Amino acid sequence: MVLAFRSHPALDDFGFAGAARPLGWWTFQAWEYQHWQGTYTTNALLTGLNPLAYGALEYYWLSPLLVLAALVLGAWQLCAALLNPPHRGPATALLLMLVLVQFPSPAEGLYWLTGAWAYLLSGAGALCWGALLARAARTRLPSHFIAAGMLTVVLMGTNYVTAALLVGVLLMILLRSEAGRRTPWLVLTALALACLGVALAAPGNAHRLASVQAPQLASSPHVVLAAVAKAGVAASYALLNWLGNGLLLAGTLLLVPTMGKLAAHPTPALQRLTRSPLLLSAVALGLVMAAFLPTYLMVQLPPPPRLRNVIYLVFVVGWLLSAYAWVAWWVRRQNRALLPLPAYVRLALLAWLPLALATDHNTHLSHAGIGQSYVTVVQAYRDWLSGDAARYDAAQRARYAALRATAAPNVGLPPLPVQPATLFYYDISANSTLWGNQAYARFFNKKAVWVQPAGTKP
């Protein structure tokens, strides 16, 4: 939260704000759908609620705080829908901790407004959506299905991968639902498919792919198979990294006794969701694998870090639910309470966890490498306490002041002295003709803006 006040906009943040101003909000939505992308919710948010669209650069810090608040709300709603009151608070805190401790890219997915609102906000919304589905399945109340339908319309317009994953979840629910109770799920699935179709049918999608000179879309069987193979390898490699350091495995092992107690008195919603551990594990793994496929089919590239943030969120939720499902299955099979972990195992794990969190793997023993960790939280503290975030913030503010103070139409700016890993996503370049530089220049009412070579006097 502290670093939110050191965050600064980049690329699309300026681009959306500058493009929407001359057209107006309503006209820009139609233009964006026709010429750039069909993600109607994201288009609306990035122009309607973007502080830069109103010239309010000084309020950019609100974005990461709002997205974090949405993530907390989503986690709380999901835990409240599945657990009894005494367990909701601890479960929410645990879920958020496990997500944030290995968050793939805070810079691109949280502190960059465009990435956060297009992707992480959809993940937070998906948690609320899952909570609504759990309540609808339990109560059968029309109000819950209506609320789920309204949120479905919103989420289908955020980004295509999140939308496709949610459609997959609905299809699985539809297939598993009882024949006499299938109608509401059928309506919800049809609504999701219709909204996804509207987003995918946007002419702007083709224009965008052409503008970035994307490779030809996967159209032949061997190209599709190659994309599937690459996605499978990339997903497997990501899973290896997420599990390989042991943080998630050790944390889950410490939770097994608590899961055993929950399994003795589960809520109906949790019992219904986890009654088939093998199927739940397969679906959770399938969703993660499937999430890597679209970018390989479209542009033959892995998912960008901002999308991997959402995939990791899906993975952690699926992992915890699957772990609980297997523990509950074992408790039912043994027909007795689960034995607690031996004291020496608990103590060893509790002693190891802080060491694993603090390590930076600085094998070269360099001063610059201190605190540069794969653990997101440790890296964030490093950027904050080392002063890098403050220096980055001061340099960005000095740029804004210089641009506002000069009447010159063409301005060269000094390079940033530091690029903290937690905050820095992208910067303008030395080439003033690139679109990022042009969007930056338009925001400050300049003709051209560029970054000067290091050592150049302003």
Model-derived regions, located:
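Intrinsically disordered, polar/acidic, low-complexity terminal segments
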Residues: 1-37, 41, 53-90, 180-182, ...
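Transmembrane catalytic cores of multi-pass membrane glycosyltransferases
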Residues: 3-62, 113, 160-307
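Transmembrane alpha-helical segments
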Residues: 70-82, 125-137, 154, 167-175, ...
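Short hydrophobic alpha-helices at membrane interfaces in multi-pass membrane enzymes
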Residues: 135-154, 182-187
